[in-house]
A protein has these predicted regions:
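Long, intrinsically disordered, low-complexity accessory segments associated with secretion
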Residues: 1-167
């Protein structure tokens, strides 16, 4: 419910909370929200870790989008095992999320997905010389092999980014 520049959020459950206690109550039925799960690897940003992300849109077709989502902590869990107990996937904090905004949640590193870039070969070519014979520039050509290892039970999408130094 919108109230000037503020929103009131209704929690769909009832609970008794003793005086001087606090309790977290679920505010979304997340099982209905379409999420895209994917991974990113960028050595210059995260080192050798592969980071896991969830992506969704705060929109009505995504079962959200009736109002902006407030600042707060988001923790992701998955159902695990035969008893379907909750298994912690990761968490992050979010800022105010407007209606129709695309959201990317950084859930942290995932040890079950590994990326190993290996420099296989390199050469210098196109050498340029100054008038006195000193080298003033060249082109370096590198050949890389990137091994991606997925130890999860499901297929994953990994965005591998390689930053090349240059001038």
């Amino acid at each position: 419910e919108e109230l000037s520049a503020y929103y009131l959020y209704t929690v769909d459950t009832r609970d008794t909370i003793p005086n001087a206690w606090s309790k977290r109550l679920p505010s979304l039925d997340v099982a209905k929200i379409p999420l895209a799960s994917y991974y990113k690897f960028e050595k210059e940003v995260w080192g050798d870790q592969v980071m896991r992300f969830y992506r969704f849109t705060n929109s009505v077709p995504s079962k959200l989008g009736k109002e902006p989502l407030p600042d707060g902590a988001v923790q992701a869990f998955r159902l695990a095992g035969k008893d379907e107990s909750l298994d912690y996937v990761g968490g992050t904090s979010v800022k105010y999320i407007p209606i129709n905004e695309h959201v990317e949640l950084d859930l942290g590193p995932d040890r079950e997905v590994q990326v190993r870039p290996v420099l296989m070969n390199w050469i210098k070519k196109d050498l340029a010389f100054e008038s006195d014979g000193h080298v003033k520039g060249w082109t370096t050509v590198e050949t890389w092999e990137v091994e991606v290892q997925n130890c999860r039970e499901i297929p994953v999408t990994v965005d591998v980014r390689r930053n090349q130094p240059g001038d």
